């Protein structure tokens, strides 16, 4: 039924359309930057000792942790990306952050739960995209997700005759959903752009703080 002759209804609709849409808040640690850095250092030391190691704390690690603390307390991005050579502790830092979340149990008021972050290897993400697409989509839509070793997975997989680009599809969907992503990779930004294309590289620039 046409409503062209109902100015009151039109005015009501225009008022509703002009109202800001309800959006979820960006994740941030509820501490000041210095406190967050101390907690992250403790969590990293705990993660190292869990595997029988001794936590050494060179200046380079101190700088990375401070950058990480600054990012996680600011709420300015929808995630972080740890870049660097193999064996420099990126996965350890990500697991330490995961454990920190489990310990402090930050309320997620939008979903009426607490924040938590599963960690999934990029190769397994590609496996799910090919063999369990429903589970793959569930990862895409998670509020928080740790993506380990981005760049070692097959760029394309085939699922029932359909070609997919697992990490490209996942990151594009997480960009749209504004999900928090904690990513580790051995790739440098130029390699990311070459492997995943300009569109995903540009979206990652919006989504995450890159820490080398």
What feature does the model see in each segment?
Residues 82:
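Hydrophobic anchor at the beta1->P-loop junction of P-loop NTPases
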Residues 1-76, 211:
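A short, basic N-terminal segment
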Residues 87-90:
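Conserved glycine(s) of the Walker
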Residues 93, 97:
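Hydrophobic positions on the alpha1 helix immediately C-terminal to the Walker A/P-loop
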Residues 109-176:
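Conserved nucleotide-sensing/catalytic segment adjacent to the nucleotide-binding pocket
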Residues 99-102:
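Walker A/P-loop NTP-binding motif
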Residues 79:
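Walker A (P-loop) ATP-phosphate-binding motif of ABC ATPase nucleotide-binding domains
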């Amino acid at each position: 039924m046409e409503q062209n002759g109902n100015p009151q209804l039109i005015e009501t609709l225009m008022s509703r359309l002009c109202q800001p849409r309800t959006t979820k808040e960006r994740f941030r640690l509820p501490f000041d930057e210095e406190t967050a850095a101390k907690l992250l250092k403790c969590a990293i030391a705990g993660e190292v000792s869990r595997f029988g190691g001794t936590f050494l704390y060179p200046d380079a690690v101190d700088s990375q942790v401070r950058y990480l603390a600054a990012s996680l307390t600011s709420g300015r991005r929808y995630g972080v990306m740890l870049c660097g050579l193999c064996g420099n502790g990126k996965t350890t830092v990500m697991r330490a952050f995961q454990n920190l979340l489990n310990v402090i149990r930050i309320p997620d008021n939008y979903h009426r739960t607490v924040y938590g972050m599963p960690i999934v290897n990029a190769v397994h993400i590609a496996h799910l995209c090919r063999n369990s697409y429903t589970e793959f989509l569930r990862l895409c839509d998670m509020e928080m997700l740790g993506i380990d070793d981005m760049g070692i997975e097959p760029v394309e997989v085939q699922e029932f005759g359909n070609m997919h680009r697992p990490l490209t599809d996942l990151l594009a969907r997480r960009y749209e959903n504004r999900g928090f992503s904690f990513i580790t990779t051995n790739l440098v930004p130029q390699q990311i752009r070459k492997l995943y294309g300009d569109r995903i590289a540009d979206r990652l620039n919006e989504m995450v703080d890159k820490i080398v």
